[in-house]
Amino acid sequence: GAGKTTLMRLLCNIQNPTSGKILLNGKNIVGLGERYRNLLGYLPQHFGYYPDFSAFDFLLYVSALKGLDEKAARKKSKELLEAVDLSRESKHKIKTFSGGMKQRLGIAQAMLNDPHILILDEPTAGLDPKERVRFRNLISAFSKDRIVILSTHIVSDVEFIAEEIIMMKSGQIIHFGNPQEITSEIDGQVWECTVPPAYAEKHAAAYNTSNLRNISGNQTILRIIGDRPSMENAVRVQPTLEDLYLFYFKGGCEE
């Protein structure tokens, strides 16, 4: 509900802004029309496909919509199916694919026109951890020599691959910068302390707790965000993106 998908649709010129404008090289994208769209590759959160199409036929179909000639489309489709590890399933119907396979096909169709700007709206939503890692690696591989804009609410999606992060809340941008810059806001406000397991849940409920971990020796480590907790053994630790996320979205900062 922060406005991520709306922002993605605005960037793709699917929706027009009610105020303000989006510029590309100093020009409003609304006036650029097809010239702008030719630079884009877009994977929406729920991309449409014909379930009885094979993966290869689907890419040929999207290539035709994008104006690619047939010879170039066939060559590019084969290359992309290989790149997203779907070449063995190229003749299989899409309705037989897993969620991760469909998402990999989705990024392949977004890359057909070799876009300068690749926009991905929550591409890892619903994927299992293994597919999520595979998809992140795929995004990193495709990011060379192009701008990749990725929306997600999953911190690990951006923690390892993003050079710059925009954090949104209630339709507003509240942070922009590289991971080190934006996490510096809560330097000195992240703590770890050890408590007996019997008191762990009580302490966790009393503070903005980002993690609770049982360790050997019958102890529990709490990771707490905010002012120094009352436990004497509390020590400051380096903040992470997840800590910052919880600071803003779990009681550390009001709307």
Question: What is the role of each PLM region?
Answer:
Residues 93-97:
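Conserved ABC ATPase signature
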Residues 12:
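Helix-to-loop junction immediately C-terminal to a conserved catalytic motif
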Residues 118-121:
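Catalytic Walker B motif of ABC-type/P-loop ATPase nucleotide-binding domains
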Residues 107:
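Hydrophobic anchor residue at the start of the ABC signature
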Residues 20-31, 35-36:
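Conserved ABC transporter NBD signature motif
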Residues 60, 64, 71-89:
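Conserved ABC ATPase "signature" region
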